[in-house]
């Protein structure tokens, strides 16, 4: 759908809200990665000595820090300009939160720009709005406010990981991974039929919901659940991690 950071190739065939939502999800995923998993790389690229820089989320789930589009007016709505200038003048978490808020605004503006260009009627716009609203905002992900009911009150020294992240706080003293493994062993490898509840758990990196059979791991600092693939952790690697810290928490502690 997009031909570059700030340009767009419009196809005049009928485009659905689902098409625009897919574009929205890709751009959002890229921005979330920049502000969480790949925050160290993002931080370095936002050099205050450089010119006005913008953070672009791309439809393929990647991101780019670069100069704004040369076209005036730009073909696509532009993200916040000059995000690099405030980097060293603010607390890092406040700086990232500010960028997240502006990014949320930009994502919606791009989505509804496409809606206008594709001639969406009232029902199509409402459907697009409902789909975009079904995901946590970038700000909620960055600030750690994503789906608080998915956090577990687990006092175990073993990191929380497994194939089924919980929907509600779990007072069980055993790690979720051990509980699930024991249940499946006793039931011949069958799940507990709670997929409907589990589907509401959101990955803190990509913002996608839980799907049956996926491996997830929970950060012991911020207690946010992640797809193992999103944070490059495999089930085998998780077995040797006593306390897991997600990339965002690790990077914050490194610079403090």
UniProtKB/Swiss-Prot annotation:
Disulfide bonds: none annotated. A zinc finger (PHD-type) spans 200-252. GO terms for cellular component: nucleus. CDD domains: PHD_AL_plant. InterPro entries: Alfin (IPR045104), Alfin_N (IPR021998), PHD_AL_plant (IPR044104), Zinc_finger_PHD-type_CS (IPR019786), Znf_FYVE_PHD (IPR011011), Znf_PHD (IPR001965), Znf_PHD-finger (IPR019787), Znf_RING/FYVE/PHD (IPR013083). Its main location: nucleus. Residues 149-195 are annotated as: Disordered. The keyword Transferase does not apply. The record marks 210, 216, 220, 225 as: Histone H3K4me3 binding. One of its GO terms (molecular function) is zinc ion binding. GO terms for biological process: chromatin organization; regulation of DNA-templated transcription. It is found in: Nucleus. It comes from the Eukaryota. The keyword Thylakoid does not apply. The PHD-type zinc finger mediates the binding to H3K4me3. Histone-binding component that specifically recognizes H3 tails trimethylated on 'Lys-4' (H3K4me3), which mark transcription start sites of virtually all active genes. Interacts with H3K4me3 and to a lesser extent with H3K4me2. Belongs to the Alfin family. This is PHD finger protein ALFIN-LIKE 4.
């Amino acid at each position: 759908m997009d031909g570059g950071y700030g340009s767009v190739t419009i196809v005049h065939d009928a485009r659905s809200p689902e098409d625009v939502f897919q574009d929205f999800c890709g751009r959002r995923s890229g921005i979330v990665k920049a502000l969480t998993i790949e925050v160290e790389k993002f931080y370095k690229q936002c050099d205050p000595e450089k010119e006005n820089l913008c953070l672009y989320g791309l439809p393929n789930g990647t991101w780019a820090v670069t100069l704004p589009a040369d076209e005036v007016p730009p073909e696509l709505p532009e993200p916040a300009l000059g995000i690099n200038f405030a980097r060293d003048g603010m607390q890092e978490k406040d700086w990232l939160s500010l960028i997240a808020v502006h990014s949320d605004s930009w994502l919606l503006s791009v989505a509804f720009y496409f809606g206008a260009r594709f001639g969406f009627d009232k029902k199509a716009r409402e459907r697009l709005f409902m789909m975009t609203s079904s995901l946590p905002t970038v700000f909620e992900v960055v600030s750690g406010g994503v789906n608080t009911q998915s956090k577990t009150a687990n006092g175990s020294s073993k990191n929380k990981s497994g194939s089924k992240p919980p929907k509600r706080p779990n007072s069980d003293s055993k790690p979720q991974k051990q509980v699930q493994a024991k249940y499946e062993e006793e039931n011949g490898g069958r799940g507990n039929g709670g997929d409907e509840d589990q589907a509401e758990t959101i990955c803190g990196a990509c913002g996608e919901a839980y799907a049956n059979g996926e491996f997830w791991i929970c950060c012991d600092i911020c207690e946010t659940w992640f797809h193992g693939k999103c944070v490059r952790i495999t089930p085998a690697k998780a077995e040797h991690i006593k306390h897991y810290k997600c990339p965002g928490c690790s990077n914050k502690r490194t610079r403090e």
